[in-house]
Design a protein with these regions (language model features):
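Minor-groove-contacting beta-hairpin "wing" of winged helix-turn-helix DNA-binding domains
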Residues: 301-306
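Short amphipathic alpha-helical interaction segments
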Residues: 276-291
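A short, conserved structural fragment
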Residues: 290-300
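An alpha-helix initiation/capping motif
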Residues: 169, 280, 307-310
Protein backbone atom coordinates (compact mmCIF):
# COMPACT_ATOMS: atom_id res chain seq x y z
CA UNK A 1 0.00 0.00 0.00
CA UNK A 2 2.88 2.40 0.79
CA UNK A 3 4.15 2.19 -2.80
CA UNK A 4 0.84 2.04 -4.63
CA UNK A 5 1.25 5.65 -5.74
CA UNK A 6 4.24 4.65 -7.87
CA UNK A 7 2.03 2.53 -10.11
CA UNK A 8 0.81 4.99 -12.72
CA UNK A 9 -0.49 2.27 -15.07
CA UNK A 10 -2.33 -1.02 -14.51
CA UNK A 11 -0.09 -3.95 -13.60
CA UNK A 12 0.42 -6.22 -16.62
CA UNK A 13 2.58 -8.93 -15.03
CA UNK A 14 3.20 -10.18 -11.49
CA UNK A 15 6.11 -12.39 -10.45
CA UNK A 16 6.33 -14.01 -7.02
CA UNK A 17 9.91 -15.17 -6.67
CA UNK A 18 13.30 -14.27 -5.30
CA UNK A 19 13.03 -16.98 -2.66
CA UNK A 20 10.56 -19.72 -1.89
CA UNK A 21 7.05 -18.23 -2.16
CA UNK A 22 5.65 -21.75 -2.55
CA UNK A 23 6.51 -22.37 1.12
CA UNK A 24 4.14 -19.61 2.27
CA UNK A 25 0.63 -20.25 3.56
CA UNK A 26 -1.80 -19.98 0.61
CA UNK A 27 -3.89 -17.49 2.61
CA UNK A 28 -0.90 -15.14 2.73
CA UNK A 29 -0.28 -15.66 -0.99
CA UNK A 30 -3.92 -14.73 -1.64
CA UNK A 31 -3.46 -11.48 0.31
CA UNK A 32 -0.28 -10.61 -1.59
CA UNK A 33 -1.85 -11.32 -4.97
CA UNK A 34 -4.94 -9.29 -4.12
CA UNK A 35 -2.82 -6.35 -2.92
CA UNK A 36 -0.98 -6.07 -6.25
CA UNK A 37 -4.07 -6.50 -8.41
CA UNK A 38 -3.00 -9.87 -9.80
CA UNK A 39 -6.52 -10.74 -10.92
CA UNK A 40 -6.22 -8.05 -13.63
CA UNK A 41 -2.71 -8.97 -14.80
CA UNK A 42 -2.13 -10.83 -18.06
CA UNK A 43 0.62 -13.01 -16.59
CA UNK A 44 0.99 -14.06 -12.94
CA UNK A 45 3.98 -16.29 -12.16
CA UNK A 46 4.98 -18.05 -8.97
CA UNK A 47 8.31 -19.79 -8.35
CA UNK A 48 8.04 -23.18 -6.68
CA UNK A 49 10.36 -25.84 -5.35
CA UNK A 50 9.53 -29.48 -6.17
CA UNK A 51 9.27 -30.40 -2.49
CA UNK A 52 6.51 -27.78 -1.99
CA UNK A 53 4.25 -29.18 -4.71
CA UNK A 54 1.61 -30.98 -2.66
CA UNK A 55 -1.99 -31.87 -3.51
CA UNK A 56 -3.22 -28.95 -1.39
CA UNK A 57 -0.82 -26.50 -3.07
CA UNK A 58 -1.87 -27.66 -6.53
CA UNK A 59 -5.52 -27.31 -5.50
CA UNK A 60 -4.85 -23.72 -4.39
CA UNK A 61 -3.08 -22.97 -7.68
CA UNK A 62 -6.10 -24.14 -9.64
CA UNK A 63 -8.35 -21.50 -8.07
CA UNK A 64 -5.80 -18.68 -7.74
CA UNK A 65 -4.97 -15.86 -10.22
CA UNK A 66 -1.63 -17.59 -10.93
CA UNK A 67 -1.46 -18.66 -14.59
CA UNK A 68 2.25 -19.43 -14.90
CA UNK A 69 4.49 -21.60 -12.70
CA UNK A 70 8.30 -21.69 -12.68
CA UNK A 71 9.91 -24.68 -10.97
CA UNK A 72 13.58 -25.25 -10.26
CA UNK A 73 14.45 -28.78 -11.35
CA UNK A 74 18.19 -27.96 -11.77
CA UNK A 75 19.20 -31.57 -12.57
CA UNK A 76 17.76 -35.07 -12.88
CA UNK A 77 20.88 -36.64 -11.38
CA UNK A 78 20.64 -37.41 -7.65
CA UNK A 79 24.35 -36.94 -6.96
CA UNK A 80 24.42 -33.57 -8.73
CA UNK A 81 21.40 -32.35 -6.76
CA UNK A 82 22.97 -33.43 -3.49
CA UNK A 83 26.23 -31.74 -4.45
CA UNK A 84 24.58 -28.33 -4.67
CA UNK A 85 22.41 -28.81 -1.59
CA UNK A 86 19.03 -29.37 -3.24
CA UNK A 87 16.40 -31.06 -1.11
CA UNK A 88 14.44 -32.84 -3.83
CA UNK A 89 15.14 -36.03 -5.78
CA UNK A 90 14.86 -36.43 -9.56
CA UNK A 91 11.71 -38.50 -9.05
CA UNK A 92 10.09 -35.78 -6.92
CA UNK A 93 10.86 -33.15 -9.57
CA UNK A 94 9.29 -35.25 -12.32
CA UNK A 95 6.19 -36.01 -10.24
CA UNK A 96 5.84 -32.34 -9.28
CA UNK A 97 6.02 -31.24 -12.93
CA UNK A 98 3.27 -33.69 -13.82
CA UNK A 99 1.11 -32.47 -10.93
CA UNK A 100 1.53 -28.84 -11.99
CA UNK A 101 0.75 -29.65 -15.62
CA UNK A 102 -2.75 -30.64 -14.49
CA UNK A 103 -3.58 -27.06 -13.47
CA UNK A 104 -1.50 -24.91 -15.86
CA UNK A 105 -0.45 -25.12 -19.49
CA UNK A 106 2.23 -22.49 -18.81
CA UNK A 107 4.87 -24.40 -16.87
CA UNK A 108 8.49 -23.26 -16.92
CA UNK A 109 11.28 -25.55 -15.72
CA UNK A 110 14.79 -24.48 -14.72
CA UNK A 111 18.01 -26.42 -15.28
CA UNK A 112 21.63 -25.69 -14.35
CA UNK A 113 24.64 -26.91 -16.30
CA UNK A 114 28.27 -26.91 -15.27
CA UNK A 115 27.42 -28.55 -11.94
CA UNK A 116 30.24 -30.14 -9.92
CA UNK A 117 30.91 -33.62 -11.29
CA UNK A 118 28.56 -33.15 -14.26
CA UNK A 119 29.76 -34.39 -17.64
CA UNK A 120 28.23 -33.98 -21.08
CA UNK A 121 26.41 -37.33 -20.95
CA UNK A 122 24.82 -36.52 -17.58
CA UNK A 123 23.76 -33.09 -18.83
CA UNK A 124 22.14 -34.62 -21.91
CA UNK A 125 20.18 -37.04 -19.70
CA UNK A 126 18.81 -34.23 -17.54
CA UNK A 127 18.05 -32.07 -20.56
CA UNK A 128 16.20 -34.76 -22.48
CA UNK A 129 14.42 -35.89 -19.32
CA UNK A 130 13.03 -32.41 -18.78
CA UNK A 131 12.11 -31.93 -22.44
CA UNK A 132 10.19 -35.21 -22.25
CA UNK A 133 7.88 -33.45 -19.77
CA UNK A 134 6.97 -30.93 -22.54
CA UNK A 135 7.11 -27.73 -20.47
CA UNK A 136 5.92 -24.56 -22.19
CA UNK A 137 9.17 -22.84 -21.22
CA UNK A 138 12.71 -23.83 -20.25
CA UNK A 139 15.41 -21.76 -18.55
CA UNK A 140 18.95 -23.14 -18.39
CA UNK A 141 21.80 -21.39 -16.61
CA UNK A 142 25.52 -21.97 -16.36
CA UNK A 143 26.43 -22.43 -12.70
CA UNK A 144 28.12 -19.35 -11.27
CA UNK A 145 30.24 -19.17 -8.15
CA UNK A 146 29.36 -16.10 -6.09
CA UNK A 147 31.60 -14.86 -3.25
CA UNK A 148 30.22 -15.70 0.17
CA UNK A 149 28.21 -18.73 -0.98
CA UNK A 150 28.68 -22.34 0.04
CA UNK A 151 29.75 -23.34 -3.47
CA UNK A 152 32.34 -20.57 -3.58
CA UNK A 153 33.83 -21.77 -0.29
CA UNK A 154 33.89 -25.39 -1.46
CA UNK A 155 35.66 -24.44 -4.68
CA UNK A 156 38.21 -22.31 -2.85
CA UNK A 157 38.88 -25.20 -0.45
CA UNK A 158 39.45 -27.58 -3.38
CA UNK A 159 36.43 -29.74 -2.51
CA UNK A 160 34.82 -29.19 -5.92
CA UNK A 161 36.17 -28.17 -9.31
CA UNK A 162 34.61 -25.63 -11.66
CA UNK A 163 33.71 -26.99 -15.08
CA UNK A 164 36.18 -25.92 -17.79
CA UNK A 165 34.87 -23.41 -20.32
CA UNK A 166 35.29 -25.92 -23.15
CA UNK A 167 32.84 -28.30 -21.45
CA UNK A 168 30.38 -25.50 -20.74
CA UNK A 169 30.45 -24.55 -24.44
CA UNK A 170 29.71 -28.18 -25.40
CA UNK A 171 26.83 -28.31 -22.93
CA UNK A 172 25.39 -25.07 -24.26
CA UNK A 173 25.62 -26.38 -27.80
CA UNK A 174 23.78 -29.55 -26.79
CA UNK A 175 21.12 -27.39 -25.12
CA UNK A 176 20.57 -25.22 -28.20
CA UNK A 177 20.42 -28.27 -30.46
CA UNK A 178 17.96 -30.22 -28.30
CA UNK A 179 15.58 -27.32 -27.70
CA UNK A 180 15.50 -26.39 -31.39
CA UNK A 181 14.72 -30.00 -32.32
CA UNK A 182 11.88 -29.98 -29.78
CA UNK A 183 10.34 -26.82 -31.27
CA UNK A 184 11.43 -24.20 -28.74
CA UNK A 185 12.35 -20.62 -29.64
CA UNK A 186 15.68 -19.47 -28.21
CA UNK A 187 14.67 -15.90 -27.42
CA UNK A 188 17.19 -14.93 -24.72
CA UNK A 189 20.60 -16.23 -23.65
CA UNK A 190 19.18 -18.61 -21.05
CA UNK A 191 15.53 -18.90 -22.10
CA UNK A 192 13.61 -21.11 -24.51
CA UNK A 193 9.87 -21.11 -25.17
CA UNK A 194 7.26 -22.85 -27.22
CA UNK A 195 5.54 -20.39 -29.58
CA UNK A 196 3.32 -18.07 -27.55
CA UNK A 197 4.90 -18.91 -24.18
CA UNK A 198 7.76 -16.44 -23.78
CA UNK A 199 7.96 -14.99 -20.29
CA UNK A 200 6.22 -11.62 -20.50
CA UNK A 201 7.57 -10.57 -17.12
CA UNK A 202 11.22 -11.34 -17.82
CA UNK A 203 10.92 -9.82 -21.28
CA UNK A 204 9.92 -6.54 -19.62
CA UNK A 205 13.34 -6.41 -17.92
CA UNK A 206 15.12 -6.82 -21.24
CA UNK A 207 12.89 -4.19 -22.88
CA UNK A 208 13.58 -1.69 -20.04
CA UNK A 209 9.88 -1.59 -19.15
CA UNK A 210 9.31 0.04 -15.72
CA UNK A 211 8.86 -2.44 -12.86
CA UNK A 212 8.26 -2.25 -9.12
CA UNK A 213 9.99 -4.68 -6.75
CA UNK A 214 8.51 -5.40 -3.32
CA UNK A 215 10.23 -7.15 -0.42
CA UNK A 216 13.79 -7.32 0.97
CA UNK A 217 16.45 -7.14 -1.74
CA UNK A 218 13.94 -6.41 -4.52
CA UNK A 219 14.93 -4.01 -7.32
CA UNK A 220 12.76 -1.42 -9.08
CA UNK A 221 13.10 0.62 -12.27
CA UNK A 222 10.66 3.52 -12.40
CA UNK A 223 10.86 6.80 -14.37
CA UNK A 224 14.45 6.13 -15.42
CA UNK A 225 15.49 5.67 -11.79
CA UNK A 226 16.76 2.47 -10.22
CA UNK A 227 16.24 1.61 -6.57
CA UNK A 228 16.71 -1.50 -4.54
CA UNK A 229 15.50 -2.43 -1.10
CA UNK A 230 17.82 -3.36 1.77
CA UNK A 231 18.40 -7.11 1.57
CA UNK A 232 18.17 -7.70 5.33
CA UNK A 233 14.72 -7.81 6.93
CA UNK A 234 15.49 -5.33 9.78
CA UNK A 235 16.88 -2.82 7.25
CA UNK A 236 13.88 -3.31 4.99
CA UNK A 237 11.47 -2.71 7.87
CA UNK A 238 13.39 0.40 8.97
CA UNK A 239 12.98 1.76 5.44
CA UNK A 240 9.25 1.24 5.77
CA UNK A 241 9.19 -1.11 2.78
CA UNK A 242 9.50 1.89 0.51
CA UNK A 243 12.68 0.88 -1.27
CA UNK A 244 14.11 4.36 -0.92
CA UNK A 245 17.16 3.28 1.06
CA UNK A 246 19.36 3.34 -2.05
CA UNK A 247 18.44 5.26 -5.19
CA UNK A 248 20.46 5.66 -8.35
CA UNK A 249 19.69 8.29 -11.00
CA UNK A 250 21.08 6.96 -14.25
CA UNK A 251 23.53 8.97 -16.31
CA UNK A 252 23.35 8.93 -20.12
CA UNK A 253 26.28 6.51 -20.16
CA UNK A 254 24.53 4.18 -17.72
CA UNK A 255 21.34 4.25 -19.80
CA UNK A 256 23.35 3.26 -22.88
CA UNK A 257 25.02 0.45 -20.93
CA UNK A 258 21.61 -0.78 -19.76
CA UNK A 259 20.34 -0.75 -23.34
CA UNK A 260 23.32 -2.77 -24.57
CA UNK A 261 23.28 -5.31 -21.75
CA UNK A 262 19.53 -5.94 -21.99
CA UNK A 263 18.92 -5.79 -25.76
CA UNK A 264 21.92 -7.93 -26.68
CA UNK A 265 20.73 -10.68 -24.33
CA UNK A 266 17.83 -11.33 -26.68
CA UNK A 267 17.21 -12.70 -30.14
CA UNK A 268 15.52 -9.40 -31.07
CA UNK A 269 18.78 -7.56 -30.58
CA UNK A 270 19.71 -3.89 -30.57
CA UNK A 271 18.68 -1.05 -32.87
CA UNK A 272 21.49 1.40 -33.66
CA UNK A 273 18.83 4.12 -33.76
CA UNK A 274 18.45 3.77 -29.98
CA UNK A 275 22.15 4.34 -29.28
CA UNK A 276 22.07 8.13 -29.47
CA UNK A 277 25.49 9.74 -29.23
CA UNK A 278 27.13 6.34 -28.85
CA UNK A 279 25.88 5.12 -32.24
CA UNK A 280 29.16 5.65 -34.13
CA UNK A 281 31.19 3.87 -31.45
CA UNK A 282 28.65 1.04 -31.34
CA UNK A 283 28.73 0.58 -35.11
CA UNK A 284 32.53 0.48 -35.09
CA UNK A 285 32.57 -2.23 -32.42
CA UNK A 286 29.84 -4.16 -34.23
CA UNK A 287 31.76 -4.29 -37.50
CA UNK A 288 34.52 -6.32 -35.88
CA UNK A 289 32.13 -8.90 -34.49
CA UNK A 290 30.02 -9.02 -37.65
CA UNK A 291 33.18 -9.85 -39.60
CA UNK A 292 34.07 -12.87 -37.47
CA UNK A 293 30.48 -14.15 -37.15
CA UNK A 294 30.09 -13.50 -33.43
CA UNK A 295 27.29 -11.05 -34.28
CA UNK A 296 24.71 -10.82 -37.05
CA UNK A 297 22.04 -8.49 -38.40
CA UNK A 298 18.38 -9.47 -38.34
CA UNK A 299 16.06 -9.00 -41.31
CA UNK A 300 14.93 -5.75 -39.64
CA UNK A 301 18.53 -4.49 -39.45
CA UNK A 302 18.88 -5.02 -35.70
CA UNK A 303 22.19 -6.18 -34.27
CA UNK A 304 22.30 -9.35 -32.20
CA UNK A 305 24.83 -11.82 -30.87
CA UNK A 306 24.97 -15.09 -32.82
CA UNK A 307 23.56 -18.04 -30.91
CA UNK A 308 26.93 -19.80 -30.95
CA UNK A 309 28.49 -16.79 -29.16
CA UNK A 310 25.80 -16.16 -26.55
CA UNK A 311 27.59 -18.16 -23.86
CA UNK A 312 30.63 -15.86 -24.10
CA UNK A 313 28.56 -12.71 -24.60
CA UNK A 314 30.02 -10.97 -21.54
CA UNK A 315 33.21 -10.27 -23.48
CA UNK A 316 31.24 -8.70 -26.33
CA UNK A 317 29.11 -6.59 -23.98
CA UNK A 318 32.20 -5.23 -22.23
CA UNK A 319 33.62 -4.13 -25.59
CA UNK A 320 30.42 -2.22 -26.40
CA UNK A 321 30.31 -0.58 -22.98
CA UNK A 322 33.96 0.47 -23.22
CA UNK A 323 33.66 1.72 -26.83
Amino acid sequence: DMRRGELTEPVSTVYLGGGTPSSLDPRLLDRILAAVGAERAAEVTIEVNPEDVTDSFVSWLGQSPVNRVSMGVQSLDAAELKGVGRCHTPERAIDAARQLARVTDNLSLDLIFGLPGQDLASWRRSLHGVLALSPAHLSAYLLSYEPGTRLWAMREAGKITESPESLAVEMYGALCEATAAAGYEHYEISNYARPGFRSRHNSSYWDLTPYLGLGPGAHSYMSGRRSYNPSDLPGYLRAGGRGFGIIEDETDAERFNDLVVTALRTSRGLSFADCGQRRAAGEKTARRYLADGAMELTAEGRLRISESSWLVSDRILVDFIDA
